[in-house]
Amino acid sequence: MKELICLGIEGTAHTFGASIITSKGDILSDVRDMYTTKKGGIIPQDAAKHHKEISNSVIEKSFKEANKNFDDINLISFSRAPGLAPCLLATKDVAIRL
């Protein structure tokens, strides 16, 4: 059976992450970027904006770390729940765009 390569995208709250994983369970990359505030905690709409703004760089770093390119990817997965709705929608939008 052919080994499959998955790009996993996570963005349920303050962290946006991208990982490349094989169907054998090998984690080839795990890159994350965290939305932070100086005071007051997570502002969901601002966290979602952060996720959209940094998604390309996080995904590119994940590919580089894994020594893979987009043509190597067989499937894309993304976090769906639980989480903050604006962040989940931003993450879904990134996955659909790909």
Task: Describe the role of every protein-language-model region.
Residues 1-98:
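Short acidic/glycine-rich loops and adjacent helix/strand connectors
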